[in-house]
């Protein structure tokens, strides 16, 4: 059976992972300015296998609201264009024969509100993940207390620590989401 400290540390690590996962997810939500991470989810059909775009092309930002995609192998240019259309990012690729330009449009107020809803939905998923970690940790603590691994005082102390970690984890998630919402609304 794990010690109370191990249970607490395990819960801390899992809660931190929820924060990292939320940051990665929110990075894909565009805020009206060019960012190569917008294309993280784009997979290009390359020699019969779906391949991340950044492995078949260089992605640069020549202007604040423009991405330039230059394939390492020009034969894959049309596949990149198809993949961008299929990705539902709402971006229209401009193929000049050797590279693709993506102009990032200014976000409309309605689109901003839609994206804020998406941020809130992702935040809620992350909060559920943190709460699930809390529940698992509490279950482990209860088992340990029942088995006599630690006394009632230690159990209550660990219970409080798990709750404090949960509160801190959720606060961290809310801070991440609030920063993204602010970025979207200022755009």
Curated annotation (Swiss-Prot):
Q: Which GO terms describe its molecular function?
A: ribosomal large subunit binding
**Keywords carried by this UniProt record:** Cytoplasm, Protein biosynthesis
- Key word Cytoplasm present in the record? yes
Is this entry keyworded Protein biosynthesis?
yes
* Cellular component, GO annotation: cytoplasm
Residues of the region (Disordered) are 141-169
* Subcellular locations according to the entry: Cytoplasm
Task: Return the Gene3D superfamilies for the record.
Answer: 3.30.1360.40, Ribosome-recycling factor (1.10.132.20)
Q: Which Pfam families match?
A: RRF
One annotated GO biological process: translational termination
UniProt similarity note:
Belongs to the RRF family.
What this chain does, per the entry, is described as: Responsible for the release of ribosomes from messenger RNA at the termination of protein biosynthesis. May increase the efficiency of translation by recycling ribosomes from one round of translation to another.
Q: Which PANTHER family match?
A: MITOCHONDRIAL RIBOSOME RECYCLING FACTOR PSEUDO 1 (PTHR20982:SF3), RIBOSOME RECYCLING FACTOR (PTHR20982)
Q: Which HAMAP family does the record associate with it?
A: RRF (MF_00040)
The protein in question is named Ribosome-recycling factor
Native source species: Limosilactobacillus reuteri (strain DSM 20016) (Lactobacillus reuteri)
- The gene from which this protein is expressed is frr
């Amino acid at each position: 059976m794990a010690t109370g400290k191990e249970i607490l540390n395990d819960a801390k690590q899992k809660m931190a992972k929820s924060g990292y996962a939320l940051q990665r997810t929110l990075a894909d939500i565009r805020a009206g300015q060019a960012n190569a991470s917008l294309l993280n989810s784009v997979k290009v059909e390359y020699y019969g296998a779906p391949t991340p775009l950044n492995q078949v092309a260089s992605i640069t930002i020549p202007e604040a609201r423009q991405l330039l995609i230059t394939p390492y192998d020009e034969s894959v240019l049309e596949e990149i264009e198809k993949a961008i259309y299929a990705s539902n990012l709402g971006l229209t690729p401009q193929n000049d024969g050797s590279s693709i330009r993506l102009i990032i449009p200014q976000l409309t107020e309605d689109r901003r509100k839609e994206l804020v809803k998406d941020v809130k939905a992702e935040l809620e998923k992350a909060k559920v993940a943190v709460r699930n970690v809390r529940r698992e940790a509490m279950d482990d603590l209860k088992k340990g207390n029942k088995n006599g691994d630690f006394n009632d005082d230690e159990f209550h102390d660990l219970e409080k620590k798990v709750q404090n970690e949960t509160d801190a984890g959720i606060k961290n998630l809310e801070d991440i989401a609030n920063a993204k919402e602010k970025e979207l609304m200022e755009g």
